[in-house]
Protein backbone atom coordinates (compact mmCIF):
# COMPACT_ATOMS: atom_id res chain seq x y z
CA UNK A 1 0.00 0.00 0.00
CA UNK A 2 1.35 3.42 -0.94
CA UNK A 3 1.15 6.31 1.52
CA UNK A 4 -0.57 9.24 -0.22
CA UNK A 5 1.04 11.87 2.01
CA UNK A 6 4.53 11.37 0.60
CA UNK A 7 3.22 12.24 -2.88
CA UNK A 8 0.98 15.12 -1.80
CA UNK A 9 1.78 18.53 -3.22
CA UNK A 10 2.73 21.38 -0.90
CA UNK A 11 1.91 25.04 -1.44
CA UNK A 12 3.01 28.23 0.29
CA UNK A 13 0.89 31.17 1.42
CA UNK A 14 2.67 34.37 2.47
CA UNK A 15 0.59 37.15 4.04
CA UNK A 16 1.16 40.55 2.44
CA UNK A 17 -1.00 42.31 5.06
CA UNK A 18 -2.23 41.65 8.60
CA UNK A 19 -5.29 39.47 9.08
CA UNK A 20 -5.08 37.13 6.08
CA UNK A 21 -7.46 34.19 6.61
CA UNK A 22 -6.64 30.73 5.24
CA UNK A 23 -9.55 28.28 5.34
CA UNK A 24 -9.49 24.55 4.57
CA UNK A 25 -12.59 23.06 2.97
CA UNK A 26 -13.66 19.42 3.26
CA UNK A 27 -14.31 16.82 0.57
CA UNK A 28 -17.68 15.18 -0.06
CA UNK A 29 -21.24 16.15 -0.87
CA UNK A 30 -21.37 18.84 1.82
CA UNK A 31 -18.34 21.12 1.47
CA UNK A 32 -17.58 22.74 4.84
CA UNK A 33 -14.85 24.77 6.49
CA UNK A 34 -12.85 22.48 8.77
CA UNK A 35 -9.81 24.58 9.67
CA UNK A 36 -8.97 28.29 9.74
CA UNK A 37 -5.67 30.09 10.27
CA UNK A 38 -5.06 33.83 10.54
CA UNK A 39 -1.73 35.16 9.26
CA UNK A 40 -0.17 38.57 9.86
CA UNK A 41 2.03 40.40 7.38
CA UNK A 42 5.19 38.46 6.58
CA UNK A 43 3.96 35.19 8.09
CA UNK A 44 4.22 32.11 5.89
CA UNK A 45 2.12 28.96 5.96
CA UNK A 46 3.21 25.75 4.21
CA UNK A 47 0.25 23.45 3.58
CA UNK A 48 -0.91 20.50 1.51
CA UNK A 49 -4.11 18.88 0.35
CA UNK A 50 -5.08 15.78 2.34
CA UNK A 51 -7.77 13.13 2.35
CA UNK A 52 -9.93 15.61 4.31
CA UNK A 53 -8.96 18.89 2.59
CA UNK A 54 -9.99 19.37 -1.03
CA UNK A 55 -9.74 23.16 -1.34
CA UNK A 56 -8.23 26.20 0.35
CA UNK A 57 -9.80 29.65 0.49
CA UNK A 58 -7.55 32.67 1.11
CA UNK A 59 -9.13 35.96 2.20
CA UNK A 60 -6.85 39.00 2.28
CA UNK A 61 -3.78 40.05 0.33
CA UNK A 62 -1.35 37.13 0.03
CA UNK A 63 1.20 35.53 -2.25
CA UNK A 64 0.32 31.91 -3.05
CA UNK A 65 3.04 29.69 -4.54
CA UNK A 66 2.52 26.20 -5.98
CA UNK A 67 4.38 23.95 -8.38
CA UNK A 68 2.10 25.41 -11.07
CA UNK A 69 3.24 28.99 -10.43
CA UNK A 70 2.38 31.86 -8.14
CA UNK A 71 -0.48 34.30 -7.78
CA UNK A 72 -1.15 37.35 -5.63
CA UNK A 73 -4.74 38.01 -4.62
CA UNK A 74 -6.07 41.45 -3.74
From Swiss-Prot:
Signal peptide: none annotated. One of its GO terms (molecular function) is RNA binding. The keyword Cytoplasm does not apply. Pfam families: TrpBP. GO terms for biological process: DNA-templated transcription termination; regulation of DNA-templated transcription. The keyword Transcription regulation applies. InterPro entries: MtrB, Trp_RNA-bd_attenuator-like_dom, Trp_RNA-bd_attenuator_dom. It comes from the Bacteria. Required for transcription attenuation control in the Trp operon. This trans-acting factor seems to recognize a 10 bases nucleotide sequence in the Trp leader transcript causing transcription termination. Binds the leader RNA only in presence of L-tryptophan. Belongs to the MtrB family. This is Transcription attenuation protein MtrB. It comes from Oceanobacillus iheyensis (strain DSM 14371 / CIP 107618 / JCM 11309 / KCTC 3954 / HTE831).
